[in-house]
C-alpha cells in the first residue's frame, strides 16, 4: 500500500505506517482464522481482532523506535491459511452507521481512525456512482461538497501484497486535486489552493480543470465522488451551478393558473402550463383522468422559454379530447400542480326532411370522415354521411375550399391553421399592392420634378436665344426710321459691319480690296453677334447705286441677292452665252472709256450712301418687310460670298456669288452728281454715251432725251422699296424732280425768314431721323460753295436754292413712279443745288476743277458721328 503511505505523511511516519500496515495485515489474518473456528458472532471476533491489532501496532511501534539498527520489524511466518467465507458487501449507509456507532462507543469524541479502517474506507471511495439526476443544478444541489479544481497528479489504486486476503478495491484512480474555486453553500470546509485526494472511476486528465461533486470521508482531505465530474468550459455550466448554490436561490416550483380552452372539432388547440418560480428548473408532466400523457401523433408536448413553460398541443381536437387536464412541475425542493379544462363543441347537424332519422356512427365507422368531419348514419338509405368543418367539403371532407370562399366565424377566439395561412396570404397581397403604389408615387414625383427642371431650362434657353438675337448695337435700329419689333428666330440675323470708321476724304477712291465674309458667326452671352472675318481679293471699281427701270432694278436685285449658284454653274444655253457676250462687250467698252476718264474725288458726304457705309449695310441686312428702302445694285465679275448665321444652325443663310454682271456707263457716275449744263457739247464722251444708251435702251430714244435731270436730279436719291408699307410713306415728304414755285420779289432777309420755316419743317422729317442731323448736313453743305446748273455765283438766292436742294437730296427714298416720270418728262429738269454730295460729272469735270482752283480748297464739313 505504498500509494497511501506516500499521500500526505512525512518520511519517518511513512515508514512506521508502512510497517504497521504490514503487521496489521498478518495479525488480522490470524485473528480472523481463530475467530472462524469459534462459534462466536462476527461482531465479537471483529472487536477482538481490532483490539489485538491495536496492541500489536503499539508494540511494534515501540520496538521500532527502540531499535538502534533501524531495520524494519518482520513478524513471524503466518500460520497456514485456511479457507474462510467471503465477507458480505455492505451498503454505504450501513458503513456510515457503523462509523457513528464506533464514535459513540469511543466516548462521543472523534478520533483518527485506525490505519486498517482508513484503508477500508478508502477502498470504498473508489466505487463509481452514476448520477441519478439529469440536471447539473440537481447534482450540485444534491452533492455535499462542490468545488472546482485542477488535477495535478494521478496514481493507480492498486491492491496490497499478494498475501493479503482483503478484496482489492474497484478499478479506478486516485487524483491529487488543487482547489481553485468553491461555493459557500457547498464548500465542505475547504480553502482555495488546498490539495485534496479524490477517488474517481471517471477518466481524468492531468492539468485539466473539473467541477467535482464530492462526498467527505472520515479522513480529512480525502473525498469520494458523488457524481461524475464535469468540464467547466461547457455552455453555462458554471453559471448554472452558481444559480443553484447561491443564498436563497433554490425554491420550489410554483405554477401559474391555467386557462381553459374551448374549440370546435378539427381545430388546433393547446393548453399552457407556466412556472412562476422554481429553482432548479422544474420538470413538467401532464395527466388526464389520473393517467400520464405522452407524446403521440395527435398530442404533442412542447417546452418554451428555456423550459420555463410547457404546452400540451392538439393538432386536430376531437370530441373525446374534452376533459380536465393536470400539469405537474417538480424539482429537488418540491412540486406543484395546476388544473385546466378543454371544451370541444360538437358540430350540429341539420338533416333534410328526406333523410329520415340519423344517428352517429359507431367507433369503427368514425374514421370514414377525415379533416375533422363528423360521421352520421342515415337510417332508411343505409348510407354514411359527413358534416365537414369550415374550409372543407365533399362526401368524406377531402376537398378543400378556396381561401376566398372560406369565411371564418368572427366569434372564434382561436383561428385554425387554414385561417392563418389565409391571413398570411392577405398580408402579402396588401404589402405587394402597397409597394406598387409607393413605387408609382415615387415615379410620378420624379417625372414632375424632371418636367419642372426641363421647363425651366427651356425658358432659360429661349431667353438666352432672345438675348443673342438682339442687335449688337442700338445704332442699327435708327438707320431705317422708327424702331421695329424684335425679329423672330426664323429671320436672318443682322451681320455686324466691320468698317466703323469712314476713310479719309483726301484719299482717291480707285480700286479697293474685295471683301469676302466667311461664315464664322458666333453668338455668346458675352459677345452678341460677332462680326465676320474679312478676306481680301481683287475687286473692280467701287459699287455704285443703279437707277434703271423697274424691270432692270428688280432683275438686278434678284441676281445680286437671291441667286445662289449662278456664279458657279456652267453656262450652256444660247441665251446665257449671248448675255455673257453682251456683258463682255460692254465691259471692254467701259475699260476703254475708263482709261480716258480722269480720276475723280469724293467728298465726305458722298461716303454716306456708299456701299461701305453703315446705312448701306443696314439696308442690305434688314429684311424687306421691315425696311422702307429696297436696295438694288449690280455686282462685279467677282462677287464675295456672304454667309450669315444665326444662333440656330438650321436658319443659317449662305449667299454664293451671283452671275458676273458688267458695269453700265450710268453706274460709273456718282450717286448724286452735278448735272451737265444744258445742251451737251460735242465730244467723244457724248458719242460714247449715246452709243451706250442706244445699245442698252433702244426704245428710250436718243441719249440727250434722257436729260440732265434724270441723271442729275433723280440719281441723287435711292430708289424706293417695292415692299415698303403704307405706314412708311409719311417719311417720304419731299419730291425731288418737282419744279419749285416761281420766286416772288422779296428782300433778302424776308426771303430767308419766310423760306426757313417750311424747309426746316421738311428737314425735321427727313427719313424719320432727327432734325439736328439735317441741320448739321445743311451747315456742312452751306460751308462748301457750289454752282447750280453750271454757274459759280454765291449769292443769297443761290444759298436758298442750295437749301431747297438739300431738302430734296437728303431724303434717299423715291418712288418708282416718280423716278419714271422724271426720266420720261419733256420739261426741263430741275437742277439741284450746287453743293451736292458728288461734285463731278463726265462733262463738268473741268468746270468743277476750275471753280475749285478759283475759290481755293473747300471747307470740309464735320463728319457726322451720329448713329446711322
Swiss-Prot record:
Organism for this UniProt entry: Rattus norvegicus (Rat)
Alphabetic keyword roster: Cell membrane, Disulfide bond, EGF-like domain, Glycoprotein, Growth factor, Immunoglobulin domain, Membrane, Secreted, Transmembrane, Transmembrane helix
Glycosylated position list: 33-34, 163, 294, 362
Gene3D superfamilies for this protein: Immunoglobulins (2.60.40.10), Laminin (2.10.25.10)
Modification note: Proteolytic cleavage close to the plasma membrane on the external face leads to the release of the soluble growth factor form.
Regions of compositional bias (Low complexity) in chain numbering: 19-75, 91-108, 518-530, 766-794
Record field: transmembrane: 430-450
Tissue: Expressed in most parts of the brain, especially the olfactory bulb and cerebellum where it localizes in granule and Purkinje cells. In the hippocampus, found in the granule cells of the dentate gyrus. In the basal forebrain, found in the cholinergic cells. In the hindbrain, weakly detectable in the motor trigeminal nucleus. Not detected in the hypothalamus. Also found in the liver and in the thymus. Not detected in heart, adrenal gland, or testis.
SS bond partners: 273-327, 361-375, 369-386, 388-397
SUPFAM superfamilies the record matches: EGF/Laminin, Immunoglobulin
Basic and acidic residues: bias regions: 538-551
Protein name: Pro-neuregulin-2, membrane-bound isoform
Alphabetized GO MF terms: epidermal growth factor receptor activity; epidermal growth factor receptor binding; ErbB-3 class receptor binding; ErbB-4 class receptor binding; growth factor activity; receptor ligand activity; signaling receptor binding
Pfam annotation, one family: Neuregulin
Coiled-coil region list: none
Domain Ig-like C2-type: 253-348
Bias (Pro residues) ranges: 76-90
Side Extracellular, residues: 128-429
Region listing for Disordered, in residue ranges: 1-114, 469-488, 516-553, 671-690, 720-806, 823-868
GO biological process: cell surface receptor signaling pathway; epidermal growth factor receptor signaling pathway; ERBB2-ERBB3 signaling pathway; ERBB4 signaling pathway; ERBB4-ERBB4 signaling pathway; intracellular signal transduction; nervous system development; regulation of synapse assembly
Lineage of source species: Eukaryota, Metazoa, Chordata, Craniata, Vertebrata
